[in-house]
Swiss-Prot record:
The lineage of its organism: Eukaryota, Viridiplantae, Streptophyta, Embryophyta, Tracheophyta. One of its GO terms (molecular function) is squalene monooxygenase activity. The chain crosses the membrane at residues 3-23, 47-67, 447-467. FAD binds at V57, G58, E77, R78, R85, F90, R157, V173, D336, M349. Pathway: Terpene metabolism; lanosterol biosynthesis; lanosterol from farnesyl diphosphate: step 2/3. GO terms for biological process: sterol biosynthetic process. It is found in: Membrane. Catalyzes the stereospecific oxidation of squalene to (S)-2,3-epoxysqualene, and is considered to be a rate-limiting enzyme in steroid biosynthesis. The keyword Ribonucleoprotein does not apply. The gene is SQP1,1. This is Squalene monooxygenase 1,1. InterPro entries: FAD-dep_OxRdtase, FAD/NAD-bd_sf, Squalene_epoxidase, Squalene_monox.
């Protein structure tokens, strides 16, 4: 009797503990199921899979690509009218290849687009005709296209909105909706002026070089390095219209190219602090008196035609901005809102199309995008894989623009002449440089090889007809400016290959 009572108490206590444990665990599981982690998006009926802010080249192309993969895409664009821009008017051969991989090659048709087979380069009375190479390794027609940017953008918008899972809406995005470091959607004002919200597991900021949302995602700032001043000369056609005319003028380059069967774009670079006023007519006088005399005689009439006929002259800032990865989840930045380089080689659209192809392929294995952690891993991979294309184009664009700047410095002017000589020399040097400029061979090592070649050609200018102390000094300065240790040392070369060449380019 005395032993029975303690046994009963022990068994009763054990039963109570087991019952309480089971009850607690079950309740805990229910709470976890009801209260998901902040990184997991709670889907609402009718929500899109992806919100894209901006329906320019990048936003429209991305919307089409993701919708073809079965994603529901909500695109919010500030102004659905046809854009009027003087940038984004040339698609390199490499860009056309990427456009075709996205199934959008027909958007460059039926807009009075002009075939471009290469460049006509002018310097101090010299002229060189250089073409994009017929390269068996490049699986597409080796020609570019010049066009009105607005016509191209409208075709892309039409193509994207033709898919049933794309909602293309006019509205102004005011801010991103953020919870615990995860972007959940956007607040925007629709075309009726009503402020509303939209939610999606992934938000893509693709609102261009004047992005208002970029600072909400990262602290990247764009640097204004110069201004592109341009206008259109109408009802005229260039001699040999399939060649873009690149003039090594002062203070920097001038370009003329056919953007329709009847219209020619004239554009030149001017640096801050020396920009005449457009509104009071000073710019028109500057173009006629200072720039026109530097334009070759066979092009000068067309250059002056637009000015004499009162064409609208525009000035647009040239910006440079390195790409940085945001620490916030549920969001990615693309296009000029993400990364900008000098437009001298007209490759901005090519870079964003490459980025879209990479991002699309990385997202394809994810059945849904609700897990912000998984999407963040995709974005990190995207940032690495894009390097072969973006690093090559960014470096080339910025380096080429520096070479085109006129200077009284003997070393810099030798580099300018060396670039002209290298481009016009023919053979593998010309074909290699044109393949790089055309996005047909976006390999960093090839870029290093040809930049070294231009540098050596420039040094030859300085040391000709025989070495002098001053020439040798300028040569050493030139090598130092180009970073000889980074280019030639085995350690730097190995690090470069590891960083850029191990990733698979699309």
């Amino acid at each position: 009797m005395d032993l029975a009572f303690p046994h009963v108490c022990l068994w009763t206590l054990l039963a109570f503990v087991l019952t309480w444990t089971v009850f607690y665990v079950n309740n805990r599981r229910k709470k976890v199921a009801k209260l998901p982690d902040a990184a997991t998006e709670v889907r609402r009926d009718g929500d899109a899979d992806v919100i894209i802010v901006g329906a320019g080249v990048g936003g429209s192309a991305l919307a089409y690509a993701l919708a073809k993969d079965g994603r529901r895409v909500h695109v919010i664009e500030r102004d659905m009218r046809e854009p009027v821009r003087m940038m984004g008017e040339f698609m390199q051969p490499g860009g056309r290849l990427l456009l075709s991989k996205l199934g959008l090659e027909d958007c460059l048709e039926g807009i009075d687009e002009q075939i471009a087979t290469g460049l006509a380069v002018y310097k101090d009375g010299q002229k060189a005709l250089v073409s994009f190479p017929e390269d068996n390794d490049f699986p597409y027609e080796p020609t570019g296209r010049a066009f009105y940017n607005g016509r191209f953008v409208q075709r892309l918008r039409q193509k994207a909105s033709s898919l049933p899972t794309v909602q293309l809406e006019e509205g102004t995005v005011k801010s991103l909706i953020e919870e615990k470091g995860v972007i959940k959607g956007v607040t925007y004002k629709n075309s009726a002026g009503e402020e509303t919200t939209a939610f999606a597991p992934l938000t893509v900021v693709c609102d261009g070089c004047y992005s208002n949302l970029r600072r909400s995602v990262n602290d990247n700032n764009a640097e204004v390095i110069s201004y592109q001043v341009g206008y259109v000369s109408k009802n005229c056609q260039l001699e040999d219209p399939e060649k873009l005319k690149l003039i090594m003028s002062k203070p920097s380059f001038t370009m003329l190219y056919q953007i329709s069967s009847t219209d020619v774009r004239c554009v030149m670079e001017i640096f801050p602090g020396n920009i005449p006023s457009i509104s009071n007519g000073e710019m028109a006088v500057y173009l006629k008196n200072t720039m026109a005399p530097q334009v070759p005689p066979e092009l000068r009439k067309i250059f002056l035609k637009g000015i004499d006929e009162g064409a609208q002259i525009k000035a647009m800032p040239t910006k440079r901005m390195e790409a940085t990865l945001s620490e916030k989840q549920g969001v990615i930045v693309l296009g000029d809102a993400f990364n900008m380089r000098h437009p001298a080689i007209a490759s901005g659209m090519m870079v964003v199309l490459s980025d879209i192809l990479i991002l699309r392929r990385l997202l394809q294995p994810l059945r849904n995008l609700s897990d912000a952690n998984k999407v963040s891993e995709v974005i990190k991979s995207f940032y690495v894989i894009r390097k072969p294309m973006s690093a090559t184009v960014n470096t080339l664009g910025n380096a080429f623009s520096q070479v085109l700047i006129a200077s009284t410095d003997e070393a810099k002017e030798a580099m300018r002449q060396g670039c002209f000589d290298y481009l016009s020399s023919g053979g593998f040097r010309t074909s290699g440089m044109m393949a790089l400029l055309g996005g047909m061979n976006p390999r960093p090592l090839s870029l290093i090889f040809h930049l070294c070649g231009i540098t050596l050609s420039s040094i030859g200018q300085l040391l000709s007809p025989f070495p002098s102390p001053l020439g040798i000094w300028h040569s050493l300065r030139l090598f130092g400016a180009e970073g000889v240790s980074q280019m030639l040392s085995p350690a730097y070369a190995a690090a470069y290959r590891k960083s850029y060449m191990t990733a698979t380019a699309l």
